[in-house]
């Protein structure tokens, strides 16, 4: 079989708008993209390997330049044929939804993987391991999935005219966008539309997923992130619509928010995070909401969990907690709602269904900085920034570390140092490595497992740094004072 015929089989399998009658038409469409010389190109039975063969043929035939961006743009164009149009996708999704939410999401997720929108091969490169801590098993990942920028693309982007379209990577306008040297190819990207709070929203998957069925729910309008009562309502409506998914929002302030504050969106998926498994350690009363169970979660960050079968009462209770926190100051533990009139408090909310009840976790956030902690008082402190210095966003709040790609090679050098081997360990790891060397015995047999455990302990410390009420006696008494204010 040829690469062309194999790809046509993939197209017909995934896209109901095409049949075998369209084979000649599709052959010509594909040849237009990869060159007539590829007509008899031998194929591969694996669709993604077959895709690689066609992209290489296009490069060999002079149809695309030798650059990463050009290859990715062509990959998306070739897989676009295998992807139904947005209107057809939406019709098929909501038809399947009638048989159950899970039926619809399973189908859309499988299609998003099969058409290479979800970059399964890149995601498989990530390093993932558990780490035992006093808070349960945390999840550590070293993110290797996002490709390094091609120097040719960086140079080309520097000379490219900026159109401002699409406004950002989350905008609905990315659906079907061809891509360019400085903007990802999205020809094969599709978004499910739905109504949320009387407005049009979109539901899609993340192309570089950080966990199972990593979904993004986005406002159809490009407007900034905000946390208010409508956020809690939206989150509970989403878990009502998709009960097998959790959903949460990043905070709406810099330092404690995510990397994309410019576009209102939430993230969810079918994954049980460590924080969801963490127990309540102290029950709390929320004034005026007797039917809402509330408690402090045993977690390195400061989390209040609200539980009720009544979503409206839960929304009102959450808004009460948010409003009290947004005005709350306790100078004894450096917690300040305002400094020079500027607000510093918000929450990171996470919703899930547990049987007939709704759970809403509210993680208290404070984005102050100080002379001692210029990156953030409640942000990873300098002594752990050799492992993690980026913002602690929604996914990490829940106990899954997203660590930078540099650590794969850097930790290997630390391990060599600990084993007394020749190494090129970076100076920023020296103090930590010396502590590890003094405290533990290192052998080739135990080095990897001990290194993973050590990274896990650092991540737990990172989360403790981000916690507004510390886990010591002073911090827990301060947390109790806040809870009495509720």
From Swiss-Prot:
Keyword field:
Carbohydrate metabolism, Cytoplasm, Galactose metabolism, Nucleotidyltransferase, Transferase
One GO cellular component term of this record is: cytoplasm
Q: Which reaction does it catalyse?
A: alpha-D-galactose 1-phosphate + UDP-alpha-D-glucose = alpha-D-glucose 1-phosphate + UDP-alpha-D-galactose
Where does the record say this protein resides?
Answer: Cytoplasm
Q: In which pathway does it act?
A: Carbohydrate metabolism; galactose metabolism
Single Gene Ontology BP annotation: galactose metabolic process
Mind listing the GO molecular function terms for this protein? UDP-glucose:hexose-1-phosphate uridylyltransferase activity
| InterPro entries reported for this sequence | GalP_uridyl_Trfase_II, GalP_uridyl_Trfase_II_CS, GalP_Utransf_C, GalP_Utransf_N
Classify the main location.
cytoplasm
**Enzyme Commission number(s) of this protein:** 2.7.7.12
In terms of Pfam families, this protein maps to: GalP_UDP_tr_C, GalP_UDP_transf
Q: Into which family does the record put it?
A: Belongs to the galactose-1-phosphate uridylyltransferase type 2 family.
PANTHER family given in the database record: DUF4922 DOMAIN-CONTAINING PROTEIN (PTHR39191:SF1), GALACTOSE-1-PHOSPHATE URIDYLYLTRANSFERASE (PTHR39191)
**Which HAMAP family does the UniProt entry name for this protein?**
GalP_UDP_trans (MF_00571)
Protein name from the UniProt record: Galactose-1-phosphate uridylyltransferase
